[in-house]
Amino acid sequence: MRWIIFSVSLLALVSCGTKVPFTNQMVEDYNLYSEKQMAKVQFYTSQTITLNRVKKVAGSNHASNGVLIENSSNFQDRITIQAQTPGVIEKSGEDGQLYIRFEQGKGKFLSFKVRPNAQNGRYYLDAQFNMNTGGELTYGEERFSVNSAAGQTYLMVIVKKIQKSTSKDRIVRGMKI
């Protein structure tokens, strides 16, 4: 009976984990300096990232039945990476960036890095942000725009705390003369 209770308790402890922001302090604490070590870590996004790209297709102007017709069309490409989407490291950059892949495909990864003035050490989405228009980044070898809220997206990881303790119980019956 004790063995069953111990096994169930251990399973509950092992399967539990808390998602926390990934920081440069974790890199030091868990010795994650190499890409090989970093490849063992499952990353998650803290919030939804929506990439937008609008491509205008050249139109044609012509006259038909006495009416001038302007033909033009737009192609909109929207990619959504939901909050808590799992990703893996693709590579690391010279300036401490982490390139995280959320899907297969050439160049389909996003860059995250620690902000120079941030004291929390979190890895935030790295894009060229403008206060008025949001940001721009490259994804899948295409330029996409992101809204300014995406700049607050950071990487998260699951941390499991396992505390192992053993005990030995025995009952002393006493001694008789």
What does each model-found stretch correspond to?
Residues 1-5:
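Positively charged n-region of N-terminal signal peptides that target proteins for export
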Residues 17-20:
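Bacterial signal peptide processing site
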Residues 126-177:
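C-terminal partner/receptor-binding element of secreted or periplasmic proteins
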Residues 12-15:
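C-terminal motif of bacterial Sec signal peptides marking the signal peptidase cleavage site
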Residues 48-75:
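Mixed-charge, low-complexity intrinsically disordered segments
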Residues 38-40, 82-86, 93-97, 139-141, ...:
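Extracytoplasmic
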Residues 73-117:
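Mid-length scaffold segments of soluble, non-membrane domains
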Residues 23-46:
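Post-signal peptide N-terminal segment of mature Sec-exported envelope proteins
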